[in-house]
């Protein structure tokens, strides 16, 4: 299982920016384009009453001033990623994805 810090580095690499935020407090002023992400669940595989595989699911929100930011397609190229929805709020485009990492 990869660490959250490894995920942070991978997201920064794909975004080509350090504007990647894990569960940011409301006091943080985000810079765009940005990726905001948080842990959503941990899937567990069991056999013989023993947990043997854990996979963490993260909800990622790509926030951009323009529609269709290229990083979305880069994220979808990662294994175990899926596109959930898109919406606009405060003149910013939001693309929401799920990633198991």
Q: Across the structure, where does each feature detected by a protein language model lie?
A:
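Short coil/turn motifs at beta-sheet boundaries
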Residues: 30, 51-55, 90-92
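Short, conserved charged micro-motifs
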Residues: 67-74
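Acidic-leaning, charged glycine-interspersed low-complexity segments
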Residues: 74-101
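Short, cysteine-centered beta-strand-loop-beta hairpins and adjacent loop/turn segments enriched
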Residues: 44-45, 66
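Short, intrinsically disordered, mixed-charge
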Residues: 13, 65, 77-81
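Small/polar-rich, solvent-exposed N-terminal microdomains that initiate assembly or binding
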Residues: 1-44, 50
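Oligomerization/assembly interface segments of phage tail-like spikes and tubes
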Residues: 54-65, 93-101
């Amino acid at each position: 299982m990869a660490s959250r810090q490894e995920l942070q580095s991978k997201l920064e690499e794909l975004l080509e920016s350090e504007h990647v935020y894990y569960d940011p407090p409301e006091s943080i002023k985000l810079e765009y384009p940005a990726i905001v992400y948080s842990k959503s669940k941990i899937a567990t595989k069991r056999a013989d009453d023993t947990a043997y595989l854990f996979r963490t699911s993260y909800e990622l929100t790509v926030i951009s001033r323009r529609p269709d930011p290229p990083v979305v397609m880069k994220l979808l190229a990662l294994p175990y990623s899926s596109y959930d929805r898109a919406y606009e709020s405060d003149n910013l485009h939001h693309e929401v994805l799920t990633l198991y990492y």
